[in-house]
Design a protein with these regions (language model features):
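Short, well-ordered beta-strand segments in beta-rich or mixed alpha/beta enzyme
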Residues: 14-28, 114-119, 165-189
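Short, solvent-exposed loop/turn elements at beta->coil junctions and helix N-caps
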Residues: 9-13, 158-163
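Short, conserved secondary-structure transition motifs
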Residues: 12, 53-68, 206-216
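Short amphipathic alpha-helical segments
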Residues: 1-4, 40, 131-154, 190
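The feature marks the first
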Residues: 1-37
Length: 225
């Protein structure tokens, strides 16, 4: 499964909250289900007990391009949600999808450590992320992104959307060769507006990568290097 032609899987030895964490990247839900079924057929599955899971799809933040597109359409006098408006948006999405295909279908980074956590945006009576104008959401997310870009050389981030699929709205996967980077990055991001005011975080899961060839060593109490 680690090198499946239909996608990739990665195994991590977890710290604190469990023993194993498996990450599956596939291009369809059917393929994800097949990965589940294949895992259940392994002899190892007799010794596994599911304690947590998360289902989501890779999602790209397109606030800047969306704001520009909406502004252009309004300036042309095109009515929001009209057939002309919808066609323009669909055409733009198709172009962006092709241009961003490597980001939509990434490889699982080869980094030694992973940190995963789910998150929501506040939507209460006092603070509601979804009631903000898109221009304001764009401003805050741009500020948020500036922090992440400062860590671009040391951590790989993959954001997934899970509204309608799981209990939280997004999943965040961080990959790095130094686990302390996770703490530094997340701590620094706590101070930007979108995190300090609108973010809600779930449990954090941290693990050490285990190649398939190292599973026997792990079961014998030796962490593969």
């Amino acid at each position: 499964m680690e090198h499946d032609v239909k996608g990739q899987s990665a195994l991590f030895s977890m710290l604190a909250k469990g023993d194993l964490l498996l990450v599956h990247f596939r291009s369809s839900f059917d393929q994800l289900k097949q990965a589940e079924l294949e895992l259940a057929r392994l002899r190892l599955s007799d010794f596994l007990e599911l304690t947590s899971s998360y289902l989501s799809v890779i999602e790209l933040g397109l606030y800047e391009s969306s704001v520009k597109l909406f502004r252009t359409l309004r300036e042309k006098g095109i009515e929001p949600h009209s057939s002309e408006w919808n066609t323009a948006i669909e055409d733009t999405i198709k172009r962006q999808t092709e241009a961003m295909r490597p980001r939509l279908f990434p490889q699982i980074p080869a980094s030694r450590y992973i940190c995963f956590y789910p998150m929501d945006r506040r939507r209460g009576e006092d603070k509601n992320w979804y009631s903000l104008p898109i221009e304001e959401r764009q401003r805050q997310m741009e500020e948020h992104g500036l922090v992440g870009r400062r860590y671009a050389g040391t951590v790989k981030q993959i954001i997934t959307g899970s509204i309608g699929f799981d209990d939280w709205e997004w999943g965040v996967d961080l990959f790095a060769d130094d686990p302390l980077i996770f703490k530094k990055l997340i701590y620094e991001m706590r101070f930007d507006e979108v995190s300090a005011v609108y973010a809600l975080f779930g449990k954090f899961f941290v693990g050490v990568r285990v190649p398939a060839t190292g599973l026997e060593d792990l079961c014998n109490g030796k962490l593969p290097q």
